[in-house]
Amino acid sequence: MVGSRHPDQCAKRWHHSLDPNVKRGPWTMEEDSSLLEAVQKIGRDWKEIGRELFPSRSTTDIKNRYVILSRRRGPSPAIPENCSSIDIETHSSSLADSKPPIPAELLTPEVDFSIANTPCELDSSNLAPDTLSINMTLPSDLPSYLSLPLPDTAETDHALDESSTAWEIPDWTAFDNQCLFTPGASELEGSFTSRNHEEPPQPLPVPDIPGPSTLVLEDLRPETVNLVIDTLLRTNSKFGMRMYNTGS
């Protein structure tokens, strides 16, 4: 008669929903108590419990009722084999909540916080070179070229123009000692005042010699050479320079 259904489906449908002899009404408190006691004695053999105590109820109804009662009473210490997924989740969350708190000494290692109030003494020998403050004096014959002052064209209003500065090699064979005026390093340094005092520099004493002059400077420090170049630029002098190393 029902060709689209399997015989097992028809039997289950009849037994669980259509059989008038199967009780489908609400459970009473006496039935709930009897069901819980039967599970404690017999176990979760729903067919056996149904034959002995609830012949008018289906095994599926008995099982579902026990799951509902278990959820109301709270999770049992052990997870049932035939328990639903809802019961398993409830049981797991209850076990997680019932775990004792982990001692703090297991989470955080013991630390003596009094060390934070103790002055820290560093050994400078273990520090990196760039973290030390070294106060040392360089030899006088080894000047620091990075700290040498260069002529400030913004203050002197003179720019070093390559077209007006001829880097020529003079004819040393025509050198005349009588027209040579070479002031010493102390005279050059004494004729200038540091720019920190904001005083105008004094001109160098130049002999009154007509015609071109040749100036030879030997064994000068780099800062002295800078002072000479600055003076020539200030006076708008046309000059040629040749720097060479005579060797030691």
UniProtKB/Swiss-Prot annotation:
It comes from Emericella nidulans (strain FGSC A4 / ATCC 38163 / CBS 112.46 / NRRL 194 / M139). Transcription factor that regulates the expression of the gene cluster that mediates the biosynthesis of cichorine, a phytotoxin active against knapweed, corn, and soybeans. This is Transcription factor cicD. GO terms for cellular component: nucleus. The keyword Signal does not apply. Residues 19-74 form the HTH myb-type domain. GO terms for molecular function: DNA-binding transcription factor activity, RNA polymerase II-specific; RNA polymerase II cis-regulatory region sequence-specific DNA binding. Residues 46-70 bind DNA. Disruption phenotype: Abolishes the production of cichorine. It is found in: Nucleus. Residues 1-25, 186-208 are annotated as: Disordered. The lineage of its organism: Eukaryota, Fungi, Dikarya, Ascomycota, Pezizomycotina. Pfam families: Myb_DNA-binding.
